[in-house]
Amino acid sequence: MSCAGRAGPARLAALALLTCSLWPARADNASQEYYTALINVTVQEPGRGAPLTFRIDRGRYGLDSPKAEVRGQVLAPLPLHGVADHLGCDPQTRFFVPPNIKQWIALLQRGNCTFKEKISRAAFHNAVAVVIYNNKSKEEPVTMTHPGTGDIIAVMITELRGKDILSYLEKNISVQMTIAVGTRMPPKNFSRGSLVFVSISFIVLMIISSAWLIFYFIQKIRYTNARDRNQRRLGDAAKKAISKLTTRTVKKGDKETDPDFDHCAVCIESYKQNDVVRILPCKHVFHKSCVDPWLSEHCTCPMCKLNILKALGIVPNLPCTDNVAFDMERLTRTQAVNRRSALGDLAGDNSLGLEPLRTSGISPLPQDGELTPRTGEINIAVTKEWFIIASFGLLSALTLCYMIIRATASLNANEVEWF
């Protein structure tokens, strides 16, 4: 597995954290208690006997508004330069107040300026209250912030109800409104401090995950370096062991030239006169040019898989890096027997001149306890550790994301808006 591949879960965790950090963009607003507003609207249409009455239960008092009951006729701003003015943000905003009206309530739409500006302009024209309807149809009323607006009452309602009332005003139909204090809604328990606590917890979890990840890479580098170092030392030992093996030149009449004699197991060619052959401790014969490269890499006989390092007594317990499947346990049990029988056969063969074994000058190699695990074992262990580390980090990111989204959903009901 490449480093880029391993970094995939880390990038995914970072992306999950970034997404969660962008989600509660407005979660910095203080969680405040608020009061609901119960609004009764009475519409007196000309030519209709009984007035039309409906109730709005989803109103909300502004944070800085007096929580009091008020009643009055609803008025909308006059058009400016022939264009309807529903926002009340222009300094030239005016209201037409009939002389017989003592108390009136301004109806304005949210947007384009702060709540404080809207409320202040209505108060300047002696409105007793301001009803601001939302500018998004699917959004609930929010708690408005408008410090310094005095004793004027400010309430927000939904866009749907606001436009219903505005439609009557545009037809010059009289609309009366009564605003009463509803229920006090306490602040939610999940506050900004809780978000900070969750964030700190996530950071701690990520630090632990990162520490494990760094430990993994250090161990991986150590395993790789140790394996490469042992392979180099094993190769050097194999070369020195090869130099201890007997070689001779095939002559006319030797048994190797007999048609019934086994061919070289490496190149599958028969032996010819003047061929240089190598005799292994197991008594198998091969072309020197064929078997030397094999022994340098595998240090075992191509036919019986005898470990020449063990057979020659150079490194008794060093396993070779032979990728061909064979029974290592069986070979270890019968190692001593094979070595004695092989050396005895070689010594009794008059056609072979076996040199005495010399082990001096060969650098000691690590024993079994010092060797690293096999490649398969390392890969299994590393894959398992990496899966745990990656899963831990990703789970931490997703857990934080879930908690922040839940916290944001709780805070949405208590959001404080300025405009």
Curated annotation (Swiss-Prot):
Glycans are attached at N29, N40, N112, N135, N172, N189. It is a single-pass type I membrane protein. Ubiquitously expressed. Highly expressed in leukocytes. Not expressed in erythroblasts. Keywords: Apoptosis, Cytoplasm, Glycoprotein, Membrane, Metal-binding, Phosphoprotein, Signal, Transferase, Transmembrane, Transmembrane helix, Ubl conjugation pathway, Zinc, Zinc-finger. Residues 1-27 form the signal peptide. It is found in: Membrane; Cytoplasm. Disulfide bonds: none annotated. InterPro entries: PA_dom_sf (IPR046450), PA_domain (IPR003137), RING_finger_E3_ligase (IPR051834), Znf_RING (IPR001841), Znf_RING/FYVE/PHD (IPR013083). A zinc finger (RING-type) spans 264-305. One of its GO terms (molecular function) is zinc ion binding. SMART domains: RING. Pathway: Protein modification; protein ubiquitination. The chain crosses the membrane at residues 195-217. Residues 105-176 form the PA domain. Its EC number is 2.3.2.27. May have a role during the programmed cell death of hematopoietic cells. Acts as an E3 ubiquitin-protein ligase. This is E3 ubiquitin-protein ligase RNF130. It comes from Homo sapiens (Human).
